[in-house]
Regions:
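Surface-exposed loop/turn elements that mediate protein-protein interactions on large endomembrane-trafficking
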Residues: 25-46, 67-84, 106-122, 149-165, ...
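An edge-strand/N-cap motif at the start of beta-rich repeat modules
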Residues: 37-47, 52-63
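Repeated scaffold domains used in trafficking and secretory/extracellular systems
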Residues: 48-57, 86-97, 125-134, 168-178, ...
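Hydrophobic beta-strand positions that form the internal "hydrophobic ladder"
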Residues: 62, 99, 137-139, 180-184, ...
């Protein structure tokens, strides 16, 4: 009889262990989108998400958006805010303290700040793209019946400020100036002979343009700088080199990568005056680039490098995982983005 009682106790003990394991497994599954602290490594933290996630940086933080909404984490892995909203094909654009969320093909666009909704705007037709500036003004590009595209400028309160319907040109991109007085539109106009691309600067309030904000734009054969009056300030000709990637810096340098002769890439760095300041030749084709102040991040197949504006290598980090995108954070920390995860790396 005593042995039977002992076996019963042992069976109960094992049952409790199994229940605990199931609970722990369920907890891990429920928190599969949270952060893991990694010790003894150059990785500061890792964030694993579900499918269809995209990542961006904002004020030194990492913002992730997916089908369940958006989240913001500090570079130490601390969650700062969370927006719960159902998305199918989400897009986001971050500037200053603002986050602009929308779905390509839907009509709604949302502006948030620190996880709180500021305004919501509904366009008449499906949205193609949208941009926000640091004051909460947005440029929303959408389709339009009877036209090729429409650009709507939305102010910081969510009200329609300006509308431009285009009958001859397709709109590739649009952006509002930092002072909210002008917006720039990149358009293409196809005809029987060729396709013409142009950048148009529009004065929103009709006042005389007094600002000196310059606009940088990349075409198929050159990098150009244009004044708000549409005057060419400088141009960099690509001289038949094959452009691979580019990153236009805000109040800093511009970087371009071209196809090399050994299945590699050549990165060229240009200052705000259009003068070349440096060059970096990679061992393999460059997958992605980013710039923050005086530091440039270069992603190759299995290596991540930080270089200066003169092209000098500052640090190199060997990658053990597949990284598709890099984003520079303060203190030269790097957000390395995979298919559905992001890791903050300190070289």
């Amino acid at each position: 009889m005593g042995r039977v009682k002992k076996n019963k106790n042992k069976s109960a003990y094992y049952a409790v262990i199994i229940i605990i394991i199931i609970i722990l497994a369920f907890a891990v599954y429920q928190n599969r989108g949270t952060l893991r602290a990694l010790n003894g490594s150059s990785e500061v933290f890792s964030y694993e998400s579900g499918q269809n996630f995209s990542f961006d940086t904002q004020n030194g933080n990492v913002v992730a958006i997916g089908s369940d909404g958006a989240q913001c984490f500090s570079d130490k892995g601390i969650r700062k805010w969370n927006v719960i909203r159902r998305f199918v094909n989400p897009r986001m654009q971050n500037e200053g303290d603002f986050n602009l969320f929308y779905e390509k093909g839907n009509k709604e666009v949302y502006l948030y700040s620190d996880g709180s909704k500021i305004w919501e705007y509904v366009s008449d037709q499906p949205i193609i793209t949208a941009k926000i500036n640091a004051k909460g003004y947005a440029a929303v590009v959408s389709y339009e019946t009877g036209y090729r595209a429409k650009i709507e400028i939305i102010d910081g309160l969510g009200s329609l400020l300006y509308k431009w319907q285009l009958s001859e040109d397709y709109v590739i991109d649009a952006d509002v100036s930092p002072d909210c007085k002008q917006f720039a539109a990149a358009t293409v106009s196809p005809n029987d002979a060729n396709v013409t691309s142009r950048v148009t600067v529009v004065d929103i309030d009709g006042e005389k343009i007094t600002g000196e904000t310059l606009l940088a734009a990349v075409g198929s054969d050159k990098l150009v700088c244009i004044s708000p009056r549409g005057e060419m300030q400088w141009a960099v000709d690509f001289e038949e080199k094959q452009l691979q990637k580019f990153k236009l810096g805000y109040n800093t340098s511009h970087i371009l990568t071209f196809e090399g002769s050994r299945n590699n890439s050549i990165l060229e760095i240009y200052g705000k005056d259009g003068k070349k300041t440096g060059e970096y030749i990679s061992g393999e084709e460059i997958k992605d680039i980013d710039i923050n102040g005086a530091t440039i991040a270069v992603l190759e197949k299995q290596e991540l490098s930080l270089i200066s504006l003169k092209g000098a290598v500052m640090s190199e980090t060997e990658l053990k995982k597949d990284v598709k995108k890099v984003m520079l954070l303060p203190k030269n920390r790097i957000a390395a983005v995979g298919s559905s995860s992001v890791e903050i790396i300190k070289p």
